[in-house]
Amino acid sequence: MKVSMFVMIVLCMVAVSSAGRGARRYCGRVLADTLAYLCPEMEEVEKRSGAQYARYGWQLPESREGARGKRGVVDECCYNSCTLDVLLSYC
């Protein structure tokens, strides 16, 4: 409970500070947490490193979420700067 409250406070601080500055970079856990906060209706995505995928000797195809692909959000918001409006377009 305390951890989730801390994460929510941090995300709110990030959102407020981003709104004043415009575009910024979101990478890794910050990107995932920000998308989870902005898009609560999105389903949880399970990691493909789990035991149920270990039996397959091939790479499973990338899942495409929403109108834009998951890799696109990394390209747009981690490698380059993006705004919260761009992040919201991935919901």
UniProtKB/Swiss-Prot annotation:
Taxonomic superkingdom: Eukaryota
Gene Ontology annotations for the cellular component aspect, listed alphabetically: extracellular space
SS bond list: 27-78, 39-91, 77-82
Propeptide: 49-69
Keyword entries, A-Z: Cleavage on pair of basic residues, Disulfide bond, Hormone, Secreted, Signal
Cited InterPro entries: Bombyxin, Bombyxin_B, Insulin-like, Insulin-like_sf, Insulin_CS, Insulin_family
PROSITE patterns: INSULIN
Signal peptide positions on this chain: 1-19
Physiological role: Brain peptide responsible for activation of prothoracic glands to produce ecdysone in insects.
Family designation: Belongs to the insulin family.
Quaternary structure, from the entry: Heterodimer of a B chain and an A chain linked by two disulfide bonds.
Name under which the protein is recorded: Bombyxin B-2 homolog
